[in-house]
């Protein structure tokens, strides 16, 4: 492949990185989809490594924090999303160890609670289903539901 194509792979990777952070595997995949050959991709990724523009650990931390702010999800869902981005298991584990699953679950539950019907039984059932679908484990869900419904009950008792 000619020199123009090699720099083109690097240029394309730099444009991708200008938009948002990417993991190494994600960049490689996008460059392959764009039609660059393996040699051009390898050279472009090597150059990005030299420039310290690819850091899977920082990328995993950034993704995890962003997902937690935008849409709090449990460990299982977050792991699956990071895996889709091509991150290795050890880096995913490091990123997830920095997350407080109880706090994420509570945040999601409190936000959802405002939209649920008034019936306490329906509220509890829908909240459990919602949190389960968000990928939280049963123990965290159980503790969180007990806590947020207890707080809500205490607040409504104070108003009476």
Swiss-Prot record:
- What Gene Ontology terms for biological process does this UniProt record contain? regulation of DNA repair
Keyword Cytoplasm, does the record have it?
yes
* Location(s) in or outside the cell: Cytoplasm
- Is Chloroplast there in the keyword field? no
Which parts form a coiled-coil structure per UniProt?
none
Gene Ontology CC, one term:
cytoplasm
Q: Which UniProt keywords apply?
A: Cytoplasm
What domain of life does the native source organism fall in? Bacteria
> Where is it chiefly localized?
cytoplasm
According to its UniProt record, which protein family does this protein belong to? Belongs to the RecX family.
Q: Which PANTHER family match?
A: REGULATORY PROTEIN RECX FAMILY PROTEIN (PTHR33602:SF1)
The protein's job, in short, is:
Modulates RecA activity.
> Under which name does UniProt file this protein?
Regulatory protein RecX
Organism annotation: Chlorobaculum tepidum (strain ATCC 49652 / DSM 12025 / NBRC 103806 / TLS)
